[in-house]
Amino acid sequence: MKLTWITIVTTKFEESKEFYRDFLGMEPGAAFSPNEFMDIAFFKDQNGMQVELIWSKKKTEASDSDHIYIGTFFDDYSKQYEEAKKRGIIKSEPAPQGPTNMCFVVKDPNGVNVQIIQPK
């Protein structure tokens, strides 16, 4: 099994694209509008895993995403932490995550939790 992508339906399309592109450093991929009520954009990490953002223009409220977490590893963990502090998006400060990793959590514009993980 190979997990290919995670889909997030958003009411904050532009802010979400900026977060995944500029903060997480994901590469923009396919982007299209299958109809007049929807825009879709994909963002890919260095291993090929993708986040699919769907903006349904008919949807005005986001659903509860507090129980969703996306885990990401960063070689320059300190740089990501400083950028997250600057943006004011930290949900939880760095803490040990198991015996070998450190982790802090940020919120994307949709309220999805993104774990920023550094191997010890």
PLM regions and their residue ranges:
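Short glycine-enriched loop/turn motifs at secondary-structure junctions
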Residues: M1-K2, A62-H67, Q97-G98
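Short, charged/polar, Gly/Pro-enriched secondary-structure boundary elements
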Residues: G48-V51, A62, G111-V114
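Short hydrophobic/aromatic beta-strand element in the GNAT-like acyltransferase core
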Residues: I40, Q50, G71, C103-V105
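Core segments of cupin and vicinal oxygen chelate
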Residues: T7-G48
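Short amphipathic alpha-helices within nucleic acid-binding modules
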Residues: F19, S78-E83
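N-terminal beta-strand motif that seeds the catalytic metal site of vicinal oxygen chelate
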Residues: M1-K17, I68-T72, K120
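Vicinal oxygen chelate
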Residues: A31, F42, Y81-K120
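Short, charged/polar surface micro-motifs in flexible loops or helix N-caps
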Residues: Q46-Q50, K58-T60, Y77-S78
